[in-house]
Structure formats: C-alpha cells, structure tokens
C-alpha cells in the first residue's frame, strides 16, 4: 500500500495550495478493494457458444450467459425453413430483450452503464413503434393487391379494416393528443367513403377510399378545429359591448393564461369596435348639429320675415302721418293768412 502511494505521489500537483489540500487528509485510512474481473470465464463461455453455432460475437453484445440462443440466429437445421424468416422478425427478436451491459468487462463507469440502459429503452420503444407501422403498411399493401386483382371478399374486407385500425392505433400512439379529439371523425370518414359494394364491382374505389381514410387518420386537422373552437369560446365569452366598455386593465386580467395570438386577435377586435363606435358617434354628432343649425336657420328666417313685415307697417304709418300733416298744414295756412300778416308763415311755427 505504501509503495502504491509513493508511486502515485509523483502524479500529484506541485503547487503549494494543492499540496496543503492533499496533506489535510489521511490517505492511509482509505482502503481500495480490488475485485478480479471474470473476463476469462465470459470469454470461455462465448467461445463455447460460438463453437455451437451462435453468431453473436461482437464486444458490445449482451453477455452470453444471460440471453438464450435464438432459433433464427443459430445454425439452420435441414428442412426447418428458418432461412425464410425476414430480417424484420430477427430484428424484432433481438430488440425484445434488454441488453445487459457488464461495465467491468467493457471498461465502463456506472454512469456510462446507466446512460446506455436509458438509451437502450428509448431505442426499444422507437423500434416497437416502427415495427407496428411496418406491419400495418404491409397488411395494407396486401389488401390493395387483393382489391386490384378483381374483387375483395368479405373476410378480406374485414382484414383490411383490421389493418386500417392497427395503423390508426399506431398513429395515435405517436400523436396521443390528436387521437382523443379526432377518433370519431376518422372512423366516420372511413365509413362514409367506403362503397357499399364490397364484392366484385368496387375494387379500385374501395382501395382508394381505404387509402384516403388511412391518410386522413394519419394526418388529422386537429390544430385548425381546436383553434376554431377556441375562437368561438372567446367570442361567446366577451360580447361586443363588453369588449368596448371594458377597461384595458380588466381585459388584461380576463386574458391571463390565453395564447398570444388570441390576445392579439381580441385586442384588434376591440380596437376595431371602438373605432367603429367612434365613427358612429362622430356621424351622429354631425347629424345632430346639422339639425340644430337648420332649426336655428329657420327661426332666424322667420324673425327676418317678421321684421320685414314690421318695417313695411311702419312705412305705411309714416306715409299716413305725412299726408295728414300736409293736409293740416295747408288748411291752417289758408285760414290765418288774410287776417294776421305778422304771423310767420313757416311750418316750424305750427310744429312748436
């Protein structure tokens, strides 16, 4: 132990702070327990399995003692027909078992082993989803081949419906939030586009309708419908009068937790309604002011006519008084002119 510490002391840093930090600890009280790595036993077991016919000899594969030999990976027996199995089935068998990594044999740390296990579980889920989709598409292609050959009997129609339902289920597993809103919509779409004649006459049309139903199920327009219902919900929540009369602070309080697009749309609608109301108010005020001015104009015209009538009456009275004065002046001058010659003959004398 002392020799090992002496050998490792040459690797220590030479800075004074680091040496003081190391000297604070008693390194002799730490015991290092070494366990022998059983690599020879694992290699011998793998050698026996390789001699028996197993093909799993890569260093990253699972330990040979934990996984049973696969019938598809072993040497084919005569007449067994195992060579006809597809590569997809072999890949499915290999991904069905979790890989058990031995960190001592591979030189991994415990953190690397945990990360490898986590990534392995994610890869298994993705591989299972891909296998479900691949199986659904293979069945769907076989159904289209049956339909294009001239007709589709009743049991083939049932298998095609099962394939379509499997594809829809796989798509819903990838998009669960779409499946909840549009499951009934996609089923109704399939029932609506499938022709009633499933026997001999409608092979091509049934294939096209089934493909359209699959496309509709894989690509549901969930966002548009959800957005449309969202708009209807907020349009019902706030009427036009409430949007116009509500203050900005109250509107912001009511719109907490709403999406940014919806807030912008409602505020634009409120601004449009307020501008429309302002324009209507200005138009009403202009019309009202026009009526007031027209009424005042009529009153002024009536007053002008009345004043004209008064002026004409006063002119007639003046003319009448003038004629009367002239008559009085002429008659008085004739009576007093012969008897009294000293009296002034000017008309101002009678006026005084």
Curated annotation (Swiss-Prot):
The lineage of its organism: Eukaryota, Metazoa, Chordata, Craniata, Vertebrata. Gene3D superfamilies: 1.20.5.170. Residues 265-290 are annotated as: Basic motif. It comes from the Eukaryota. InterPro entries: bZIP, bZIP_Maf, bZIP_sf, Maf_TF_N, TF_DNA-bd_sf, Transcription_factor_Maf_fam. The keyword DNA-binding applies. Keywords: Activator, DNA-binding, Nucleus, Repressor, Transcription, Transcription regulation. Belongs to the bZIP family. Maf subfamily. GO terms for molecular function: DNA binding; DNA-binding transcription factor activity. One of its GO terms (cellular component) is nucleus. Its main location: nucleus. Homodimer or heterodimer. Binds DNA as a homodimer or a heterodimer. Residues 72-82, 207-221, 338-352 have a biased composition (Low complexity). Residues 195-206 have a biased composition (Gly residues). This is Transcription factor Maf. Residues 293-314 are annotated as: Leucine-zipper. Residues 265-328 form the bZIP domain. Residues 57-85, 173-234, 331-352 are annotated as: Disordered. Residues 176-187, 222-232 have a biased composition (Basic residues). Disulfide bonds: none annotated. Acts as a transcriptional activator or repressor. It is found in: Nucleus.
């Amino acid at each position: 132990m002392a020799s090992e510490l002496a050998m490792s002391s040459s690797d220590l840093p030479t800075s004074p702070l680091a040496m003081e930090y190391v000297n604070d600890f008693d390194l002799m009280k730490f015991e290092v327990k070494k366990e022998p790595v059983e690599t020879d036993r694992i290699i011998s077991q793998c050698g026996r399995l390789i001699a028996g016919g197993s093909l799993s000899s890569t260093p990253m594969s699972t330990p040979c003692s934990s996984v049973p030999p696969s019938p598809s990976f072993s040497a084919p027996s005569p007449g067994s027909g195992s060579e006809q199995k597809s590569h997809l089935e072999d890949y499915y068998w290999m991904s069905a078992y979790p890989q058990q990594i031995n960190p001592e044999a591979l030189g991994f740390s415990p953190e690397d082993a945990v990360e490898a296990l986590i990534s392995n579980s994610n890869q298994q889920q993705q591989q299972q989803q891909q296998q479900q989709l691949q199986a659904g598409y293979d069945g769907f292609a076989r159904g289209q081949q049956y339909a294009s050959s001239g007709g589709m009997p009743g049991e083939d129609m049932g298998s095609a419906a099962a394939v379509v339902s499997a594809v829809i289920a796989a798509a819903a597993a990838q998009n669960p939030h779409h499946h909840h809103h549009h499951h009934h919509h996609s089923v109704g779409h399939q029932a609506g586009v499938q022709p009633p004649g499933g026997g001999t006459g409608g092979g091509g049309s049934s294939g096209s309708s089934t493909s359209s139903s699959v496309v509709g199920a894989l690509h549901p327009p969930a966002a548009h419908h959800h957005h449309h219902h969202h708009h209807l919900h907020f349009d019902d929540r706030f009427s036009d009068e409430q949007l116009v009369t509500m203050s900005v602070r109250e509107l912001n309080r009511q719109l907490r937790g709403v999406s940014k697009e919806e807030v912008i749309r409602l505020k634009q609608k409120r601004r449009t309604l307020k501008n429309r109301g302002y324009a209507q108010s200005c138009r009403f005020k202009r019309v009202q002011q026009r009526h007031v001015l027209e009424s005042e104009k009529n009153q002024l015209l009536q007053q002008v006519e009345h004043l004209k009538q008064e002026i004409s009456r006063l002119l007639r009275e003046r003319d009448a008084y003038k004629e009367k004065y002239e008559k009085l002046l002429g008659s008085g001058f004739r009576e007093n002119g012969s008897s009294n010659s000293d009296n002034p003959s000017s008309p101002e004398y009678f006026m005084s």
